[in-house]
Amino acid sequence: AAGLFCAAQLAKCGGKVVILDNGKKVGRKILMSGGGFCNFTNMELSSGRYLSQNPHFVKSALKRFTQWDFIGLVAEYGIPYHEKELGQLFCDNGAEDIVNMLLAECKKYGVEIALRQSISAVAKTENGFSVVTNGETLYCTHLVVATGGLSMPGLGATPLGYQIAEQFGINVIAPRASLVPFTWRECDKFYAALSGISLDVAATNQHKTFTHQMLFTHRGLSGPVILQISNYWQPGESIHLDLLPYNDIR
């Protein structure tokens, strides 16, 4: 999503832009997001809701491009959407609407898209950068690395972006899993009998408390509250679950 959107914006400003994608089609992660309906923005955006070691960047980024800017683009393409709890906006018809919108923006401004690309080398040149892909060397004055994280390798995720960053001396924070479910230990697997049951809980660790829906699965615990608390959980820490968060039984 970031690569497609960035490419369209750069081309809109007059640049000649080429996207190199290692997949057979673009936007595959978008199609998986939001359970297939793409939670494309949130009505309650603020810098305090982001985990970042540089909060000033978050403030400046959100000031320059707000949720309303993206909502306006969605409305321009006539994409129907609805608001769920906590200000989340989802497509009515499915995530493919967002992919098609981004592709239409790229096409409108003349962005070229090359698929099934295997980048083997990136280097700094006198006038910009060189990129070796599929045995061919391409040259550019500016290079944007928008490879995303390491999640979902089956959809093409690779460590290439991290490798390029390290190659050019950019400090890389060791990646760790976040927004992820928790899996049962072997001794806890009897809870799998509860698979499919969901309820509101308060999940607390040493740093944060979130109150939202939790889902029992055959492999462990999931749902919005678990995905949120996973951002703050550290290996070895305990998480306390209050199954009656709205009741004081004292």
Question: What are these model-predicted stretches?
Answer:
Residues 1-2, 25, 149-151:
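Residue-level detector of alpha-helix initiation sites
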Residues 142-188:
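Glycine-rich loop(s) and the adjacent beta-strand/alpha-helix scaffold that form part
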Residues 64-142:
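Feature captures the FAD/FMN-dependent oxidoreductase FAD-binding
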Residues 1-19:
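N-terminal Rossmann-like FAD-binding beta1-loop-alpha1 element of flavoenzymes
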Residues 24-26, 31-32, 41-47, 171-174, ...:
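An anion/pyrophosphate-binding glycine-rich loop and adjacent beta-alpha core
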Residues 16, 112, 238:
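Residues at the starts of beta-strands that form the adenosine-phosphate
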Residues 35-85:
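Glycine-rich active-site loop/strand segments that organize a redox cofactor
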Residues 20, 119-120, 137-154, 165-166, ...:
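Short hydrophobic core segments
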